[in-house]
A protein has these predicted regions:
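Exposed acidic/Ser/Thr-rich ligand/metal-binding surfaces
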Residues: 2-192
Length: 192
C-alpha cells in the first residue's frame, strides 16, 4: 500500500521490511512487487527469479506514497501472477480501507476468491487504527494465511522481518488429516 495515508514513518518502515524480505529470498524463489494507491504499479510484468532482488530493492527505495487505496485491483493483479505449479505466498500490507475502485468488502472477497489459486496462501498486515479488519481477516482465513495488525507506534519492519524468517523455509506444507470415520467437531486452524 503506497497510498497517501502511508506517507512518513509507516511507508519508510514498509520499505525497510520489503528490503529485508528481498535480501533474504531463497535461491529458487520467484517474486514480484505490486504497489497500489489510486492505481497499481508492478516491479515486473511477471514473477522474477531471486537474483533480480537487488534491482527490486532499488526500485522499492524510489517509491513514494500518494493517492487513494484500490485494494481490489491490487489483489486481482497479484492473483493473476500465481503459478499453479508452485506454492505461492502473497504478503499484503495496507493501512486503511478500500477507497478507490471496488470498495465493498463482500465484493472484494468474492472477486479475490474467484481469481485466487486454491493453493495461494495470503498473509495480511494491517497498519494503524483505521483498518478494515473484517476484510483483512476474511481474506487471510479464506486463503490459508493469517492476519496481523500493527499500531502506528509499533515497528512494522521488525514484525515483517520476523514473519518472513518464519515462512521463508516451511517445514510442512500441504497437510491433510484423515480421521478414519471419526466424528470431529473442531479443527484449528480451519482450513488446515
Amino acid at each position: 500500500d503506497r497510498s497517501g495515508s502511508m506517507d512518513g514513518e509507516k511507508f519508510r518502515q514498509a520499505q525497510q521490511a520489503l528490503d529485508y524480505i528481498l535480501s533474504h529470498l531463497n535461491p529458487g524463489d520467484r517474486f514480484n512487487i505490486i504497489t497500489f494507491s489510486t492505481g497499481t504499479e508492478r516491479y515486473a510484468n511477471r514473477l522474477r527469479p531471486a537474483d533480480y532482488a537487488g534491482n527490486a530493492r532499488t526500485w522499492v527505495n524510489g517509491l513514494r506514497a500518494e493517492g487513494s487505496t484500490d485494494i481490489n485491483r491490487a489483489l486481482l493483479e497479484a492473483a493473476d501472477m500465481v503459478d499453479d505449479d508452485r506454492p505461492t505466498y502473497l504478503i499484503f500490507l495496507t493501512d486503511g480501507l478500500p477507497t478507490e475502485g471496488v470498495t465493498d468488502s463482500e465484493r472484494i472477497l468474492s472477486n479475490f476468491a474467484g481469481a485466487a489459486s486454491p493453493d495461494l496462501r495470503l498473509f495480511v498486515f494491517g497498519v494503524g487504527y483505521d483498518v478494515d479488519t473484517y476484510l483483512l481477516d476474511s481474506l487471510a482465513q479464506g486463503h490459508h494465511g493469517s492476519s496481523s495488525y500493527v499500531l502506528p507506534e509499533d515497528r512494522l519492519d521488525e514484525l515483517l522481518s520476523t514473519f518472513y524468517a518464519r515462512i521463508s523455509t516451511p517445514v510442512l506444507t500441504g497437510l491433510a488429516l484423515d480421521f478414519d470415520g471419526l466424528v470431529t467437531y473442531d479443527l484449528y486452524p480451519s482450513p488446515l
